[in-house]
Amino acid sequence: MYSYGDSQVIFDLNMNCRKVGITAILGRNGAGKSTLLKTISGEVSYSEGQIIYDGIETKFESQDIRCLRGIGYVPQENAVFGSLTVHENLLLGGISLKEKCDIDVVLDYFPKLSQRLNQQAGTLSGGERKMLAISRSLLGKPKLLLLDEPTEGVWVGVIEEISQILQKLSKELAIILVEQHVKLALDVSNYAYVMDRGRVAMHGDSIKMKDDPKLLKLLAP
């Protein structure tokens, strides 16, 4: 599906995502999880296969077009402007989109940010920066939200907070979640895929997958 130079990174991938709810993508480092999200978002191109979103093939659509059509993407890397305030970062969310969600509506999901609107984003904790990145993406009113490791480097208390936020969001839109915390991912998701070396090695209902011994083997270092 996706190749970098002469090297193929993702192979024979067949996935479906519900219109509402969370689909988790699990796997060891280097399995192709982040590459998959980058490909869906349009950050990287793919040479073979198809990605169908809302009934339309996305191969020849730029990342901006996909964003306009409702695909939001929060990468693993720091996605906020540290020199700007929280409020200024939010104003940038969906700035080029015709239809934007009201900032106050988004902040209902993230009450901590409401108390830090005039604070520089660079002074926020890791968890708060993750929340800001997600909230800024939500201002574009996505139908599909791609989240790459939203709890990476986040204090355990904030992880639970992010988990609750994701569960609330999942009632209104589709989320594809790449997550290193397997228990969290399976707790919040409806369906899960496990990738291994660029392929889907296992998939099924998240509840049933928790007790499957095959999962531990696939995720073992």
Please give the residue ranges for each predicted region.
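Conserved ABC ATPase signature
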Residues: Q120-L124, E128
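Catalytic Walker B motif of ABC-type/P-loop ATPase nucleotide-binding domains
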Residues: L145-E149
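ABC ATPase NBD coupling module
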Residues: E57-N78, Q115-N118, M209-P213
